Each structure stands twice: as structure tokens, then as C-alpha cells.
Amino acid sequence: MKVMSSIVHSNTPLLVVIDPRALVVRSVQFCRTVAGQPLAARVTHQRYDRAGRPVVGRDPRLFSRSETEAQTPANRVVRFSLSGAALLSESVDSGWRLNLMGEAGQLLESCDGRGTQRLMEYDSSLRPVSVTEQGLVVERLAYGGADAAEHN
């Protein structure tokens, strides 16, 4: 393993761009592999919705491509419900994931680009009682009643 000298990392600034809501919309880090070489900018970009939730993100790898190729996808795109729950997330690295929520905001079902389907069942107190993946129950949860305190 090659250990880089600390001189390579000295005097490398970090620039941060914030919007009026104090959300970081861009950060620019600088990279150099040999002391004395010019710095190369590495830009990370975020876009937020009106509620301040991150909806689009690009790392330096795809940000630099997006400047020359208009059709370059973002690393991560998230769609939120009106209540603020992430309904759909799309990632160039991990694929897509769809979440279906219940009336109380609990996760009922999720599926992803790999074909994994996950179902959650809840009791009357909205505590999860079972998790089913690909049609098979993979988790069962049980909770003690109010009268169980006597036995502890």
C-alpha cells in the first residue's frame, strides 16, 4: 500500500455553495496526486425540493460528464410523497426501489430493480409482526402484553 505524503494534501481548499435555505447545493473538492501538480476540481451537486429534501444528487464522476453530455443521469433521484416519505429512489449504482406506504405512514410493500418484493404486516398498534420476501415469511415479531411486566 502506497502512503501519500501529507504535503500532497496540504493547502487543498474545499469550497461549499449554499442556497438561501443554508442547504449545500455544491461542494468542490480539489485533488492532486503529486505535490506541485495543478489541482483538479471534483464537484458534488445536490438539488432539493421545496421542503428541503434532497431529490437529485451527482457525485464528481457523473457531474463532470453531465457538463458535456446533457443526457447523463444523476447518481440518485428520489421522489417523495406529500407526507415526506421516499416513494421511489433511482440510483445508477444500486438500481431503483419503490416503497408503498399505508395511511399511517408505515411501509406496506417495497420492490426493487433486482426483483425483490418485500411485504410488511402490522398489528393494531402498527408494530411490524411479519416480513415476507418473495412469498416466504422471513421474519416474525412478537410483543409482550401490558400484563407481562409481572413476570420480569
Label for each model-derived stretch:
Residues 1-152:
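Beta-strand elements of repeat-based all-beta scaffolds
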